[in-house]
């Protein structure tokens, strides 16, 4: 199984070790699924960790490197423009499409989750994903 994990889920996995988002990343670490990310997602991760959380550059780079090592990195070619309010969210959708993933996992309840799917790819929250694929967690 292949998944794209939105930036907000990556950040949650760093903040709440052992939490739901971290359980998703643990599935990747354990080899139970593949995570597909794009350069945009990694750059956005670095930007948020630097600007919002004010982490030092070394800690930010360490986090980005960790996810980059775990992930398959794709370069989306198709342009998606379905989210008008926050256009950068379209880059997450493009990654999922380019990676031919089975699920897009996000915590974005305002822009991404309401879409429910994109080009046949289900869009789900972390808890929903874990309930479906790891009952009992």
Q: PLM ranges: what are they?
A:
Residues 14-15, 49, 116, 134:
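Short, flexible helix/strand-to-coil boundary loops that buttress conserved ligand/catalytic motifs
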Residues 7, 39, 107-109:
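Short secondary-structure boundary segments
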Residues 40, 61-83:
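Acidic catalytic patch
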Residues 5, 15, 20-50:
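PIN/NYN-family metal-dependent endoribonuclease catalytic core
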Residues 19, 36, 58, 62, ...:
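Residues at secondary-structure transition points
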Residues 83, 90, 97, 102, ...:
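Acidic, PIN/NYN-like endoribonuclease modules and their adjacent C-terminal/linker elements
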Residues 1-2:
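Residues that mark the start of a beta-strand
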């Amino acid at each position: 199984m292949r998944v794209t994990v939105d930036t907000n889920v990556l950040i949650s996995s760093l903040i709440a070790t052992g939490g739901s988002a971290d359980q998703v990343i643990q599935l990747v670490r354990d080899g139970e699924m593949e995570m597909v990310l794009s350069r945009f997602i990694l750059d956005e991760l670095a930007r948020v960790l630097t600007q919002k959380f004010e982490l030092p550059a070394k800690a930010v780079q360490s986090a980005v490197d960790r996810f980059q090592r775990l992930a398959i990195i794709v370069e989306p070619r198709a342009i998606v423009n379905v989210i008008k309010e926050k256009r950068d969210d379209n880059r997450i959708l493009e990654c999922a499409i380019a990676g031919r993933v089975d699920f897009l996992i996000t915590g974005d309840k305002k822009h991404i989750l309401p879409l429910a799917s994109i080009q046949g790819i289900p869009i789900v929250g972390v808890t929903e994903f874990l309930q479906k694929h790891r009952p009992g967690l």
